[in-house]
């Protein structure tokens, strides 16, 4: 797979879980003999939702909730077949969304 690059994007609501997953990916791929760039922290997406506290009246009383989406980017340059195989076998938490582009 000479001259190829694999780009992995991780998304999660918990920054600790995404950092552990990124560290696991980097360790696995470097052990298999490929070069890794990253993990690069991408900007955190923050969604704020405004909700009226009362079900019927008192519109001035509102409550704000926010959801933060943390993102990381990992590039694998010149991946070996062993690195790709070990990457496919890697067990990661369910709350981490993984996008892989070749």
UniProtKB/Swiss-Prot annotation:
UniProt-recorded Gene Ontology molecular function terms: structural constituent of ribosome; tRNA binding
UniProt xrefs under PROSITE patterns: RIBOSOMAL_S10
The organism's place on the tree of life at top rank: Bacteria
Pfam families (UniProt xref): Ribosomal_S10
Family note: Belongs to the universal ribosomal protein uS10 family.
Role noted for this protein: Involved in the binding of tRNA to the ribosomes.
PANTHER family, A to Z: 30S RIBOSOMAL PROTEIN S10 FAMILY MEMBER
Name of this chain's protein: Small ribosomal subunit protein uS10
Gene from which the chain derives: rpsJ
């Amino acid at each position: 797979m000479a001259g190829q690059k694999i780009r992995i994007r991780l998304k999660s609501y918990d920054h600790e879980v995404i950092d552990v997953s990124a560290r696991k990916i980097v360790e696995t791929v470097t052990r298999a003999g490929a070069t890794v760039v990253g993990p690069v922290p991408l900007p955190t997406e923050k969604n704020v939702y405004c909700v009226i506290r009362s079900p019927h009246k008192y519109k001035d009383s509102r409550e704000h909730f926010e959801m933060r989406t943390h993102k990381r980017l990992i590039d694998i340059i010149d991946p070996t077949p062993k690195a790709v195989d070990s990457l496919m076998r890697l067990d990661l938490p369910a709350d981490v969304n993984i996008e892989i582009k070749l």
